[in-house]
């Protein structure tokens, strides 16, 4: 089969590799119909080279059709259309039962001191071959695969693999309630969807903050108010809200970007959040999504929620059966470009770490 492989820092190639096969009776093989480049993939492109081996298959956002299933797999069968979540979990351990699938005790990479195994994401997370390929082996398939309806564009469901549950969860952690004004800092793929999820969860107004004109325009088209290039973002948000500020703030700039200055500005946007509260939060709560605290800092009404790998939920129980989330998947489809798998390298070179702006679904070439 053809697959996108890591060959060194800033070097990926589409190569011929062996087809995957069942390794356990709980596995399934999925023929990939669409996959996507995630912002996390760009960490592999440059930063996480020490944890990759030449030839590793990349990708952790994919969907397709089940073509083979192990004897213990009963929930899906060949011919089913499925989405493959980023994290690999058993669904039955203590962590999974509490919605912390990315800390699954069965697939946890204990030797590395990390959480559950992840598709296409370095030796730190199990070196599991990823989904930017024509076929992928899915462990714990009964729990890991999300059946979706046949027909329609893949992009209608593809984002359920990672980005949409992440955005939905951010809005949930912000405790968005009807009538709220929500500020979203960073309108990249996750931030854009988090803003739209906040609207679907009842926010009366959502104000998005970014510097990229294309992102601001896409947000406007989705009914999101925007704040662009300004010397004083908190002042701009305060002006839009009559001096009251936002009720909830979602920070989605990510670990590559501006760091503490953005977070400091974000804290200043929150309604009535005094410096004696905001400064200790900024000093003691990490903001990188790979190091944010799994707990919650609570000082009276203001609260900082950390979203680290231990709290990032899959689109599964309880979210898998959340009809509103599935409705959001319908609303999210259709964005980004759709080059074939063979053009993955060019897409990375064109995007770069600081220029990637939109999701990019990938479609393996049609069979002859």
Task: Set out the residue ranges of the language-model regions.
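Mid-domain Rossmann-like dinucleotide-binding core that forms the NAD(H)/NADP(H) cofactor-binding site
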Residues: 81-82, 134-135, 143-231, 235, ...
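Glycine-rich beta-strand-centered segment in the early N-terminal region that forms part
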Residues: 18-35, 48-97, 101-102, 129, ...
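Cysteine-cluster motifs in flexible loop/terminal segments that predominantly coordinate metals
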Residues: 38, 86-150
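Residue-level recognition of short, solvent-exposed, well-ordered loop/turn junctions
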Residues: 23-25, 77, 177, 244, ...
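Residues in the short beta-alpha loop(s) of Rossmann-like NAD(P)-binding domains
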Residues: 212, 312, 337
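C-terminal hydrophobic helical "lid"/dimerization subdomain
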Residues: 1, 294-298, 338-368
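Glycine-rich cofactor phosphate-binding loops and adjacent beta1-alpha1 units
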Residues: 174, 217-330
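Cytochrome P450 core scaffold surrounding the K-helix E-X-X-R motif
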Residues: 39-45
């Amino acid at each position: 089969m053809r697959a996108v492989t890591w060959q060194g820092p800033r070097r990926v190639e589409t190569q011929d590799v062996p087809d995957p096969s069942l390794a356990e009776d709980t596995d399934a093989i999925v023929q990939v119909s669409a996959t996507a480049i995630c912002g996390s993939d760009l960490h592999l492109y440059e930063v996480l080279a020490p944890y990759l081996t030449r030839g590793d298959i990349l990708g952790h956002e994919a969907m397709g059709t089940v073509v083979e299933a192990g004897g213990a797999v009963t929930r899906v069968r060949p011919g089913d259309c499925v989405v493959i979540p980023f994290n690999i979990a058993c669904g039955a351990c203590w962590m999974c039962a509490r919605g912390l699938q990315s800390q699954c005790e069965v697939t946890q990479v204990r030797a590395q001191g990390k959480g559950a195994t992840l598709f296409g994401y370095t030796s730190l997370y199990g070196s599991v071959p990823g989904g930017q390929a024509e076929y992928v082996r899915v462990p714990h398939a009964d729990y890991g695969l999300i059946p979706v309806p046949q027909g329609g564009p893949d992009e209608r469901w593809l984002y359920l693999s990672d980005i949409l549950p992440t955005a939905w969860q951010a809005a949930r952690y912000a405790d968005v309630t009807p009538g709220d004004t929500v500020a979203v800092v960073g309108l990249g793929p996750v931030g854009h969807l988090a803003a739209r999820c906040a609207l679907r969860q009842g926010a009366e107004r959502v104000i998005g903050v970014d510097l990229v004109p294309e992102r601001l325009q896409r947000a406007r088209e989705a009914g999101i108010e925007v704040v662009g290039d300004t010397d004083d973002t908190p002042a701009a948000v305060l002006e839009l809200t009559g001096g009251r500020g936002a009720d909830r703030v979602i920070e989605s700039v990510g670990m590559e970007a501006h760091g503490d200055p953005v977070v400091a500005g974000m804290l200043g946007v929150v309604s009535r959040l005094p410096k004696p509260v905001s400064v200790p939060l900024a000093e003691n709560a990490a903001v990188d999504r790979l190091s944010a605290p799994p707990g919650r800092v609570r000082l009276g009404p203001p609260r900082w929620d950390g979203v680290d790998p231990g709290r990032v939920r899959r689109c599964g129980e309880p979210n898998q059966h959340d009809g509103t989330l599935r409705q959001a998947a319908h609303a999210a489809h259709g964005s980004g470009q759709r080059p074939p798998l063979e053009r993955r390298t060019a897409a990375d070179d064109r995007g770069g770490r600081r220029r990637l702006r939109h999701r990019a679904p990938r479609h393996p070439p049609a069979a002859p």
